[in-house]
């Protein structure tokens, strides 16, 4: 599913234009007060823009009409946040997911719940666990599984790496890759974790002062000089590669993981030394 925001005005944003590409991972990054979450709420139809066009798969929604079925749209666009509502803490995972399914008029289905949990790497034993006993990363996985249980075409993930260590980030990376490649999901990530974004995203929008500062291919964006006047961190691997280029005058293709970069350097050195024919 492709989503286009055309001349959207909402909050402090004026004439915002953005395209979320079908079956791709699009990242939206910016300072904490930049308005990323507002865009996430608009994309997931939880917040109605003041004006502009909201286009889904080339079908234009008239936002001025009162009969737009936002509830129907929420079947297709799932919004996942880190914080679990404290009112759900006493519920078991099964009770929580069953309630959420009922909100979307789905009948109780233990199989659907277990299948969704397995998609995010949680086994069936979790259905009897209370939300309050779960770790932050497990709660996020349950929130994601709950959203996946209604089978949305689009996933909007708000700050998904907030409570994750490096090993759990790697698991999330694999999960997002699975969602995109196997299940053909369109994924939006709102985050400032640029090291993670470099690994997982296809396309990036940078938000600064309630405007789009730059957007494009992840390598073009994260190596852009336009980021110098922002608080956005440059990924460590890009910092290293730029330092390597400055020291050696060797220009290599940008990579999103260390192993590929090391292979490129090794290949270049071997070729220069005559070790490769």
Regions from the language model: what does each represent?
Residues 191-192:
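H-loop/switch region of ABC-family ATPase nucleotide-binding domains
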Residues 144:
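Hydrophobic anchor residue at the start of the ABC signature
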Residues 211-234:
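Conserved beta-strand-loop-alpha-helix hinge in the C-terminal portion
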Residues 44:
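Helix-to-loop junction immediately C-terminal to a conserved catalytic motif
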Residues 130-134:
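Conserved ABC ATPase signature
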Residues 61-78, 103:
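ABC ATPase NBD coupling module
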Residues 108-126:
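Conserved ABC ATPase "signature" region
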């Amino acid at each position: 599913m492709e989503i286009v925001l055309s001349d959207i005005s909402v909050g402090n944003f004026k004439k915002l234009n953005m395209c979320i590409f079908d079956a791709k991972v699009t990242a939206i990054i910016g300072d904490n007060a930049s308005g990323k979450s507002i865009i996430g709420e608009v994309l997931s139809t939880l917040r109605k823009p003041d004006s502009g066009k909201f286009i889904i798969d080339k079908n234009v929604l008239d936002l001025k009409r009162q009969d737009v079925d936002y509830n129907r749209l929420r079947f297709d666009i799932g919004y996942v946040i880190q914080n679990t509502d404290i009112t759900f803490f006493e519920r078991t995972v099964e009770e929580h997911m069953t309630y959420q399914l009922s909100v979307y008029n789905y009948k109780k289905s233990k199989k659907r719940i277990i299948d969704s949990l397995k998609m995010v790497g949680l086994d069936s034993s979790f259905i009897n666990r209370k939300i309050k006993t779960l770790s932050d990363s497990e709660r996020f996985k349950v929130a994601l599984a709950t959203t996946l249980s209604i089978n949305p075409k689009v996933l909007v993930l708000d700050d998904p790496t907030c409570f994750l260590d490096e090993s759990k980030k790697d698991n999330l990376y694999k999960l997002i890759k699975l969602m995109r490649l196997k299940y053909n999901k369109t994924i939006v990530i709102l985050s400032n974790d640029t090291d993670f974004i470099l690994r997982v995203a296809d396309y990036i929008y940078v938000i600064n002062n309630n405007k789009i500062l730059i957007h494009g291919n992840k390598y073009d964006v994260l190596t852009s000089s336009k980021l110098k006047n922002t608080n956005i961190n440059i990924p460590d691997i890009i910092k290293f590669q730029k330092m390597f280029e400055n020291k050696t005058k060797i220009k290599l293709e940008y990579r999103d993981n260390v192993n590929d970069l090391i292979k490129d350097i090794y290949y270049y050195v071997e070729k220069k030394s005559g070790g490769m024919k």
